[in-house]
């Protein structure tokens, strides 16, 4: 057993329910463990050492909240949570992300992204290659349940690609970004890519000249 939730619950007088783990690549030996007391939506986040099978002494520890936390690097987390009372969307999700450095208190975390209160949800994250290597920051804004603004931050500058907000960013592999279209879209050259098409393109080149993205078709429905 890597983490005995029954024993932990007994020791802490809680009823911990496992809400997930985000492990830091490429070693995957440090994980952010999300635990919910009694299974509610809100959870706490604690840093866990897989090899030691123990929580890290003086490691990252986020108090209970409806939140997400992801690794930027071994000493930095991107945390999206209700930083100030009422700082949630109408759907009840946080939309402000701050960077939290190891050893900092929550009030020392620096804001790096703010969505809009009208969004369904929003947050900042990271893009990694298949080997876990950091590529760049990303962000998303859930405009509604069918439309999302997906942004990338090459050199720290926000770039939004010209695809419909219904398009879904699906994968990144060795420099190639993969999207699935959920409505028809025409490139600057006039090439029409139909609803349901799966397309791929060189992300670095696309971000340098987003108006002229010309993808390759991986799959086109009949």
Predicted regions, residues:
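Beta-propeller folds
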Residues: 1-222
């Amino acid at each position: 057993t890597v983490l005995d939730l029954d024993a932990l619950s007994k020791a802490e007088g809680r009823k911990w329910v496992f809400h997930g783990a985000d492990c830091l690549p490429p070693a995957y030996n440090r994980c952010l463990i999300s635990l919910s007391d009694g299974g509610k939506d809100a959870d706490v986040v604690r840093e866990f050492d897989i090899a030691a099978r123990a929580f890290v002494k003086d490691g990252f520890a986020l108090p209970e909240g409806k939140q997400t936390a992801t690794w930027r690097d071994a000493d930095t987390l991107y945390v999206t949570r209700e930083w100030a009372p009422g700082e949630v969307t109408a759907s009840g999700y946080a939309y402000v992300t701050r960077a939290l450095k190891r050893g900092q208190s929550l009030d020392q975390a620096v804001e790096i992204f703010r969505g809009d209160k009208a969004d369904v949800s929003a947050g900042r994250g990271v893009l990694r290659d298949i080997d876990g290597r950091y590529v760049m920051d990303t962000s998303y804004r859930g405009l509604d349940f069918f439309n999302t603004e997906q942004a990338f931050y090459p050199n720290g500058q926000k770039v939004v690609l010209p695809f419909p907000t219904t398009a879904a960013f699906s994968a990144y592999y060795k420099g190639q970004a993969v999207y699935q279209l959920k409505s028809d879209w025409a490139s600057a050259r006039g090439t029409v890519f139909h609803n349901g098409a799966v397309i791929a393109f060189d992300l670095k080149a696309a971000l340098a000249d987003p108006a002229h993205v010309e993808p390759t078709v991986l799959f086109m429905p009949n």
